[in-house]
């Protein structure tokens, strides 16, 4: 039996991230780490944080109408696997 990787497979070293989205800030939880990191919901803060993330990490966030879009777009452009969930 052979297995194949798909475009949505996480890269080696990738992490799973959950993001609670707000209009002014993002609360970020990383699987295996204790606590939550709060970032301003701005291009600069998000881009800086994404530079420290392993390529191909999986980032899941709630659909908030518009406030999630900045994180979703920047994460996608940075090579992350992005899930926008509609609760």
Per-region residue spans from a language model:
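Phosphate- and other anionic-substrate recognition elements at nucleic-acid/protein interfaces
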Residues: 1-87
């Amino acid at each position: 039996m052979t297995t194949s990787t798909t475009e949505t497979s996480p890269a080696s070293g990738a992490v799973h991230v959950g993001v609670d989205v707000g209009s002014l800030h993002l609360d970020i939880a990383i699987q295996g780490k204790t606590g939550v990191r709060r970032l301003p919901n701005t291009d600069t803060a998000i881009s800086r944080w994404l530079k420290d993330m392993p390529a191909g990490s999986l980032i899941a966030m709630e659909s908030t109408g518009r406030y999630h879009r900045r994180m979703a777009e920047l994460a996608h452009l940075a090579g992350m696997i992005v899930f926008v969930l509609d609760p």
